[in-house]
From Swiss-Prot:
Keywords, in A-Z order: Ribonucleoprotein, Ribosomal protein, RNA-binding, rRNA-binding
Name of protein: Small ribosomal subunit protein uS3
Alphabetical list of NCBIfam families matching this protein: rpsC_bact (TIGR01009)
Family, similarity comment: Belongs to the universal ribosomal protein uS3 family.
UniProt keyword Ribosomal protein present: yes
All copies of domain KH type-2, residue ranges: 28-96
Keyword rRNA-binding: yes
GO biological process: translation
Biological source species: Shigella flexneri
Functional summary from the UniProt entry: Binds the lower part of the 30S subunit head. Binds mRNA in the 70S ribosome, positioning it for translation.
Matching Gene3D superfamilies: 3.30.300.20, Ribosomal protein S3, C-terminal domain
Encoding gene per record: rpsC
InterPro entries for the chain: KH_dom, KH_dom-like_a/b, KH_dom_type_2, KH_sf_prok-type, Ribosomal_S3_C_sf, Ribosomal_uS3_bac-typ, Ribosomal_uS3_C, Ribosomal_uS3_CS
A molecular function GO annotation: structural constituent of ribosome
Length: 233
């Protein structure tokens, strides 16, 4: 029986960055890992309606820095920054060190696998037909410039007695190409018939140059210089 490696795991260090970037000795490693897990668990539960894509944790010099990638930064920040300050205090209590929280906006949620999967699950929980939800997600991603997308749902689809798997693909999704920038994520829809699993693969193109090209900050587009009009003498 064929087995598939995790699409993100095999690309770590090639074209995918880690979600936790810190170094610890043997004594501190387990505690750091445990607090990382608890911080992610708390933020995921607290920001369930804020369209959170990923949470990146860094630990510089006895402190913790959490970057929340979200499509709805206004909900995370709250009125005058009250909500984000509350999150910062709880994260500091969980980690036991001073905390800093940064918010990064996801510009195109239709091209983010986690947000697409969450969108499909929320539609399934509202009793939208699964085929319609899948096709809508595929069309939106391709319209916004994805090279390819594959969506798979499995479970008691439409309330059927026997669980089955259905998938829909458009474009190309080259899983064997390690330099391919493939965003993969999953989500679960809790319906009256049981749990329906959703998997999403989005191919955004190939990254040439490895991690150096990934970590390079995007340069802002150069604005054309305005020509100064000479005044009449």
């Amino acid at each position: 029986m064929g087995q598939k490696v995790h699409r993100n795991g095999i690309r770590l260090g090639i074209v995918k960055p880690w979600n936790s970037t810190w170094f610890a000795n043997t004594k501190e490693f387990a505690d750091n890992l445990d607090s990382d897990f608890k911080v992610r668990q708390y933020l995921t539960k607290e920001l369930a309606k804020a369209s959170v894509s990923r949470i990146v944790i860094e630990r510089p010099a006895k402190s913790i820095r959490v970057t929340i990638h979200t499509a709805r930064p206004g909900i995370v920040i709250g009125k005058k920054g009250e909500d984000v300050e509350k999150l910062r205090k709880v994260v500091a209590d969980i980690a036991g060190v001073p905390a800093q929280i940064n918010i990064a906006e996801v510009r195109k949620p239709e091209l983010d696998a986690k947000l697409v999967a969450d969108s499909i699950t929320s539609q399934l929980e509202r009793r939208v037909m699964f085929r319609r939800a899948m096709k809508r997600a595929v069309q939106n991603a391709m319209r916004l410039g994805a090279k390819g997308i594959k969506v798979e749902v499995s479970g008691r689809l439409g309330g059927a007695e026997i669980a089955r798997t259905e998938w829909y693909r458009e474009g190309r999704v080259p899983l064997h190409t390690l330099r391919a920038d493939i965003d993969y994520n999953t989500s679960e829809a809790h319906t009256t018939y049981g749990v329906i699993g959703v998997k999403v693969w989005i191919f955004k193109g190939e990254i040439l140059g490895g991690m150096a090209a990934v970590e390079q900050p995007e340069k802002p587009a150069a604005q054309p210089k305005k020509q100064q009009r000479k005044g009449r003498k």
